[in-house]
């Protein structure tokens, strides 16, 4: 038995078994209490984009994080009831465009009910390997192929292997904390 198989067996043995779907379990914490607490967890602001057979689509997200650097993989969480969900599932590619401090209004466009064409018309885009839209002046863009999707509650967690990236050294970052945007100033090396 390999170390990975042994570890998985140990994890499976220690996790409680249940036939009840996660969404039907009684919550130990109230939904609003949880949301209020999560608002205190600051994060980068991202516009997630895709293009392909399912169409061109994009949405604003803060539920993005690194998974591993070998292979370079990140995750993106997407509500299955979101209007853009079918496009992302069908295309199986996406780009995580991490926003600069000048992108607050663009974040609001992609986070609302603005028609998709108007969202994309508000900025300049290019593409790299997958054909997903790359925001030309993003702080960083991670061009990805979706390698795995896991359902948890109301959301799909998309695990995405980074196949290309692009960094911009000429801007500062944008964070979302306590339901407000905050600029993040980069340290300039001498």
UniProtKB/Swiss-Prot annotation:
Report which superkingdom the organism of origin falls in: Bacteria
Asked whether the keyword Manganese is assigned, the reply is no
Which reaction is catalysed here? FMNH2 + NAD(+) = FMN + NADH + 2 H(+)
Pfam families in the record: Flavin_Reduct
Entry EC no(s): 1.5.1.42
Q: Which GO terms describe its biological process?
A: nitrogen utilization; uracil catabolic process
Would the keyword NAD turn up in this protein's UniProt record? Answer: yes
Member of which family?
A: Belongs to the non-flavoprotein flavin reductase family. RutF subfamily.
Q: Which PANTHER family match?
A: FLAVIN REDUCTASE (PTHR30466), FMN REDUCTASE (NADH) RUTF (PTHR30466:SF1)
What is the name attached to this protein's record? FMN reductase (NADH) RutF
Q: Which organism is it from?
A: Pantoea ananatis (strain LMG 20103)
